[in-house]
Amino acid sequence: MEMKNIDFILESDEALKPSERLVLLLLEKHRMLYTNDLLALSNLSYKTLTDALTALVLKSYVLKETGKGRRQNCYRLV
């Protein structure tokens, strides 16, 4: 699986909405984030966040390592 790099994210300015660029930059830095973490870091609404994530990232429904058995959406770069 190829990772998008930060140069690609910054150069593809016209192709991406600001919210999409922000999400990609956050994932480039952190490699993997859960929904609540992305919401907190990006300050985007849930709808804007999920719209930005739709085609750009790999989503999986996983057990959070620090959680008490609750499953959460986890996002990584595709």
Predicted regions located by residue number:
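A short, conserved structural fragment
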Residues: 57-67
